[in-house]
Amino acid sequence: MTLPAFKAYDIRGRVPDELNEDLARRIGVALAAQLDQGPVVLGHDVRLASPALQEALSAGLRASGREVIDIGLCGTEEVYFQTDHLKAAGGVMVTASHNPMDYNGMKLVREQARPISSDTGLFAIRDTVAADTAAAGEPTAAEHSRTDKTAYLEHLLSYVDRSTLKPLKLVVNAGNGGAGLIVDLLAPHLPFEFVRVFHEPDGNFPNGIPNPLLPENRDATAKAVKEHGADFGIAWDGDFDRCFFFDHTGRFIEGYYLVGLLAQAILAKQPGGKVVHDPRLTWNTVEMVEDAGGIPVLCKSGHAFIKEKMRSENAVYGGEMSAHHYFREFAYADSGMIPWLLIAELVSQSGRSLADLVEARMQKFPCSGEINFKVDDAKAAVARVMAHYGDQSPELDYTDGISADFGQWRFNLRSSNTEPLLRLNVETRGDAALLETRTQEISNLLRG
């Protein structure tokens, strides 16, 4: 039995061909064997197939004697939070996040919301399922419904001093995913006026798959910000583990510039802390962390690597340019809710707009944003780039792919962990023309 839905970090595949209720039940049995003793937290996103997949997963776990805590429709971060908060043995979020309509998936964690990835149990689960030894009898253990979100909401609100918050007007675009439910629960505790876009959870995704990284999905948020004169806008993906920002002009803010901003917000509350960041774009983050008295720590991109590094370094915050933001007190997990609360606090306390907070940083360290290339031979494409620049003797780093630092500009080139792509990021020290030249130059080399 081949199981293509098992990826390096999670399970993702087409329903029902690559992921279905029979497989979900078997995954439940196999997962039970991987976890320490204790209950397992389960939750699901808005996709139409998600409740049935969760039910089958639960049946497999309970047939293996595992108590299940069902937290129902939620965001991925809620499974992380409740797994840690309830001291459960593990947790599973049934979600395909921003994948196409016919997909579904699972994100798995063990105790303390520690990720279960390929080399920490996920492929062992796959092999058990594939060997067909994960058959299960009737469920014997209990399932409890726990939909009370009070502890989670209180934790989110603990990141900001509500007495300093101004009555900002915020556009919130849940993309018909799950974020709107949490915004509505937070709203009574905050002085903000919310303009709600695509707010109702709807697994049919009538307004398209919620993936704000796609330029065509940004228009609705940008337009609403401008039409309503909002202070800024926030858009989430389907399971709201990532959030994306738009300034008061409707301009999309690259996730890179949010990392430094959020680092400063956290370091103001936890001085001298370590901040973990990825190698794709670094100069702005390193400077802002050091200016705030923090210690930057470089780490390979990907949530499993970032979380592991944060734990080993006791880092207060971790940020990736891909809009994943991790917080120590949040079980070292990523949250799509904490960042916008911190940015709203920053805007309130500083009296400056989001645009103003990032503009100087964008000028000082302009970046290309991530550019993807489909290439037939990735090694040959990378070799062409390195041969072209080899005589310039760049400082090289291999933390994640290849990072080459030329003093006034740098690039990072890496293979995707999940797709057959090369990903390029370029940044310069305040030179937009050089950025354009080098980005075009490398793009041509990669295309051969």
UniProtKB/Swiss-Prot annotation:
MF terms (GO), sorted A to Z: magnesium ion binding; phosphoglucomutase activity; phosphomannomutase activity
Name of the protein described by the UniProt record: Phosphohexose mutases
Catalytic function, reaction form: alpha-D-glucose 1-phosphate = alpha-D-glucose 6-phosphate; alpha-D-mannose 1-phosphate = D-mannose 6-phosphate
Family from the record: Belongs to the phosphohexose mutase family.
InterPro entries documented for this protein: A-D-PHexomutase_a/b/a-I, A-D-PHexomutase_a/b/a-I/II/III, A-D-PHexomutase_a/b/a-II, A-D-PHexomutase_a/b/a-III, A-D-PHexomutase_C, A-D-PHexomutase_C_sf, A-D-PHexomutase_CS, Alpha-D-phosphohexomutase_SF
Chain residues that bind Mg(2+): 97, 237, 239, 241
Keyword Phosphoprotein listed: yes
Role, per record: Involved in xanthan production.
Primary gene name: xanA
CDD domains in alphabetical order: PMM_PGM
Pathway: Nucleotide-sugar biosynthesis; GDP-alpha-D-mannose biosynthesis; alpha-D-mannose 1-phosphate from D-fructose 6-phosphate: step 2/2
Cofactor binding comment, as recorded: Binds 1 Mg(2+) ion per subunit.
Listed cofactors: Mg(2+)
A Pfam family per the record: PGM_PMM_III
Major enzyme class: isomerase
Active-site residues, Swiss-Prot/TrEMBL: 97
GO biological process, one term: lipopolysaccharide biosynthetic process
Source superkingdom: Bacteria
Protein species of origin: Xanthomonas campestris pv. campestris (strain ATCC 33913 / DSM 3586 / NCPPB 528 / LMG 568 / P 25)
Keyword field: Exopolysaccharide synthesis, Isomerase, Lipopolysaccharide biosynthesis, Magnesium, Metal-binding, Phosphoprotein
EC numbers on record: 5.4.2.2, 5.4.2.8
Tagged with keyword Isomerase: yes
